[in-house]
A protein has these predicted regions:
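Glycine-rich beta-alpha junction loops
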Residues: 37-41, 61-64
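Extended, intrinsically disordered, low-complexity segments
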Residues: 76-131
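Alpha-helix-loop-beta-strand connector modules within alpha/beta enzyme cores
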Residues: 4-33
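Short low-complexity, flexible loop/linker segments enriched in glycine and/or proline
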Residues: 71-75
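Generic structural signal for well-ordered alpha-helices
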Residues: 10-17, 46, 114-121
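Glycine-rich phosphate-binding active-site loops on the catalytic face of alpha/beta enzymes
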Residues: 1, 52-70
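Catalytic cores of alpha/beta
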Residues: 38-53
Length: 131
């Protein structure tokens, strides 16, 4: 989503935690929150929300777009190789099978997907946290 369309206000999370903690005499951050609609939020907002009890953030929209970016970039790069089975800028008799093979362009989608996942792991302070 376009930055600014979804406005994250972490102070609401803090105030909710403080109220519940005060009312029920619990420990710090007694409620686990899920962060819906994180697309377009700044890293500072995400980190602040985590500090106030966010334990899950939905990133599906960002991941879908990241996968599509890889496929799109592949198609743009090899468009002249994807128009016919035989014949490309290298010659009229040159085969194009290795370019339109789905394993090639799907892999480019996977690589941009992985890159976006790694960014999310970093943003969410979740690098190297599994034993």
């Amino acid at each position: 989503y376009k930055p600014g369309n979804v406005v994250l206000r972490p102070i609401i999370l803090k105030n909710s935690q403080d109220y519940i903690q005060s009312k029920f005499h619990t420990g710090v951050n007694p409620v686990d929150f899920v962060f819906h609609g994180g697309s377009g939020s700044t890293l500072a907002e995400i980190r602040e929300a985590i500090g106030y009890g966010v334990v899950k953030m939905n990133i599906d929209t960002d991941l879908q777009f990241a996968f599509t970016e890889g496929v799109r970039d592949y198609v743009v790069k090899y468009v002249e190789y994807l128009k016919t089975q035989i014949g490309n800028p290298e010659g009229d008799d040159k085969p194009n099978k290795k370019y339109y093979d789905p394993r090639k362009w799907l892999r480019d989608g996977e690589l941009t997907f992985i890159k976006r996942l790694e960014q999310s792991f970093s943003d969410l302070n979740n690098l190297n946290t599994l034993i």
